[in-house]
Amino acid sequence: MEIDERPPKTANSDGRLIDHPVFRSGTVIPTEPINELYQMVRQLVFVRETGCCFTAHSGVGKTRALMMLEHLVRRRMPEVLVIPHNTWNHQVVSIRAFYKHFLAAIGHPDLRGETFDLRHRLIRRLVDMARANKSPVVLLLIDEANAMRIDDFLFLKDVYNELDKDGIQLITVMMGQEPDFGDVLALLRERGRLDLISRFARRKMIFRAFSKEEDFRGLFRHFDTSIYPMEGGLTWVQHFMPAAWEKGFRLADQVGTFLDAVDRCATPASRSVGIPGRQLFIAIRRYLLEQMFREQSKKAFAELGWDDSLAYAMLDDAIDTINQEEKRERKKR
């Protein structure tokens, strides 16, 4: 059998759909939880607090939140030098390897030398970057903080002290997964390193999941108003549902219907736990695809489309996992 490998030329061919921002892994939307995160970090910078940590359960959207936070800080506070860092020390076998990894992450070309040389080079690089940026503040965003070790905290303390000698303030923002990050802090207390907790992790806050009606309304409105491509394109929703759009359909008007479906599809505790970003975005993509396919096939609008999409996203299972994690966390207290 001969297979035609040429992509279809329809407006919503698979190739074009995959390239749409709705499906791109790098698309990050300024949601209400992320806006709250930015406001808290903004205050942290203004009052010159040395650090804080945010925690959340699996699937809430921690990494995406830090990506958007980095973007917002760079745009709104250009005088602040922002350095993102992903902790993966369970795979780093030595502190020397850690320094090499960090140097590579900030673009330093020379990864040779002994541990002391690498450490000195890394600290001087951070100082030079701050000076070049004419920045009085270095904001270090640490993802996967639940993988940090005591050596990492000691390194942060060294960096803080060295930058302070040059009149530069280091502020660390850690994002870690619960209950694992709690184990990290418990180990610091067990080892008597309250100085490290005091400097970097005394202020512990929650990066919350989607839970408020305005969270969903703001997110859905973003889908209604974002244009792709930027010049002469369609709104994201219009791209998938042109006929429904012409008849006045708007995703923001679906919030009540969506929340009713959440109540039907998930456990009663779902509203209090919140909806993880991972499951929410899977459900939205699934919903838009299903309505698009139905529209193209001249089928009736799927009135229970949200029920099917939430079931596909396995929302109930994700919330059950969060509940189990919270029970485990409570037992440790």
Map each language-model feature to its residues.
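Pre-Walker A adenine-sensing motif
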Residues: 32-49
